[in-house]
Amino acid sequence: MTDTSSGFDELRTLIARHGTATPVAIGEAAVISRVEETGPPAFSTTGTVFVLMAQGEKRLAVGELVHVYGAEQSMIASVDLPITGHFTRASRREPALGFALTLRPALVAELLLHPAAGRLPRLSRGAPAPGITVGDPSVELVDAVLRMVRLIERPDDLAVLAPLVEREILWLLVRGPLGTAVRQLGLAESTVNRVGHAVQWIRDRYAEPLSIEELAEVAMMSPSAFHRSFQAVTAMSPIQFQKQLRLQEARVRLLADPRDVAGAAHAVGYESASQFSREYRRRFGASPLQDVAGLRQGAGAR
């Protein structure tokens, strides 16, 4: 067993050697990356994922809530959330070095069926775990991640050993201090999973009018309980969540065709172009045309 500092030292060496700005896969569910510039905030979605930052720092904004995780910290996203994120510490001399593992609910559920899971603390009946949590990894967790990353230099062993180490990482997450979020991901009837179904429903229909009653039915909850739970998990109301998706999709459309602001607004569900422009400016700090012009100019400079 390595101690935390030496484990991170080797992890940094391996990721610096093999990582690139485009994530490099290790088996089916894990990736490493090396990012050498901070860059502007960019929209993406989290997926359900465990991230271990070996070096650097990243800032994620989920609605009005901001999460920052840095060197030797971990982040868990138990719901696929829309975020605006960017690295705040990354350079050619000291790149951001990270490991990420997709959290697969079926594997988490399988671990929760093991007799050893019966000794885990019972989940609280209070508010659900937030969709994003940040914390410090244990020595055992860093060691397991290190053994996963070492497999990139052992291609003959990768297919056999990567699934075993993945299970170990998941188990350590389940029984660790941030385990509530991961355990809820594996329980079909958990609040996090129910909210996750509603999140996907909104994603698939973001341009349509939103009905809290219909969303509550999707989540199999009362409207009042659903609204509280959605806010607790996503840090946004359902309306705010939908607005985030609409504005980001409109931004993508305007980058492709900046001449048709009204068309982009209508395509993502806005009936009023003026309301769209007001909310766009509030979200991105500039009018649609000014924002897109700045993005295009920045892309051209790079």
Model-predicted segments: where are they?
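Generic C-terminal helix-cap and adjacent flexible tail
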Residues: A293-R302
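Short alpha-helical segment immediately N-terminal to, or the first helix within
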Residues: W201-R205, V252-A256
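Amphipathic alpha-helical segments enriched in hydrophobic/aromatic residues interleaved with Lys/Arg
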Residues: T2-G7, V108-L172, T180, A198-Q200
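N-terminal regulatory/effector-sensing and dimerization cores
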Residues: T22-P121
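A short, N-terminal "cap"/entry segment at the start of jelly-roll beta-barrel domains
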Residues: M1-I26, V31-S33, G39-P40, R125-P130, ...
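Residue at a beta-strand N-cap/secondary-structure junction
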Residues: R59, P209, P258-R259
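Basic/polar phosphate-binding segments, predominantly the helix-turn-helix DNA-binding elements
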Residues: E168, L172-L178, L185-L187, T191, ...
